[in-house]
Amino acid sequence: MTSEAMDTLGQYKITVWEEESFQGKRCEFLMECPSIMERGFRKIRSIKVESGPWVGFEYPEYQGQQFILEKGDYPRWEAWSGNSGYRTEHLLSFRPVKCANHNDSKAILYEAENFQGHKFELSDDYPSLQAMGWGNKEVASIKVNAGAWVAYQYPGYRGYQYVLERDRQNGEFKKYSEYSSQAHTNQIQSIRRIQH
């Protein structure tokens, strides 16, 4: 076991079930899982996060839509997709969000790609970026200086979710297509710090 794995042992724990309402085959994880199918599962339909924040993905190898999974119970897909407007009834891969630090999170939003144009510095949650002074519905690039964030397509933490971490891509997302493997738009209207 690597020293990194030893350092995080116990900080992250997730239990997954193959069926809704915590039924069927189950398995506990303390580390990332690039493909639940390699563990003999067809899909994940319910989840219990016991410690640490996690991000779940629609497809194997951390591809597809992202869904933030913070401490709590997720008996059905609606619990993790929330008001996303995007329906995915299962997850096929997941990993811990190791750099989440709710008390020390900083990010800068930019109106143009490559960190150009008008910028907006963040250190708090914003259920509506426009209500807080961001002039438009789009964010073309983001620099995460500390912690981890989840950005949403619409106000009120709704729509597609993009998990943005300081320790991924050095915290630099130069264009919206780097927000996730399935980033369909640069429309971001709410953003919050990930709870640890």
Swiss-Prot record:
A GO BP entry: lens development in camera-type eye
PANTHER family registered for this protein in UniProt: BETA-CRYSTALLIN A2, BETA/GAMMA CRYSTALLIN
Role of this protein: Crystallins are the dominant structural components of the vertebrate eye lens.
Gene3D superfamilies in UniProt: Crystallins
Protein name, entry field: Beta-crystallin A2
Keywords, alphabetical: Eye lens protein, Repeat
Subunit composition and interactions: Homo/heterodimer, or complexes of higher-order. The structure of beta-crystallin oligomers seems to be stabilized through interactions between the N-terminal arms.
Annotated GO MF terms: structural constituent of eye lens
Matches recorded under SUPFAM superfamilies: gamma-Crystallin-like
Chain's gene name: CRYBA2
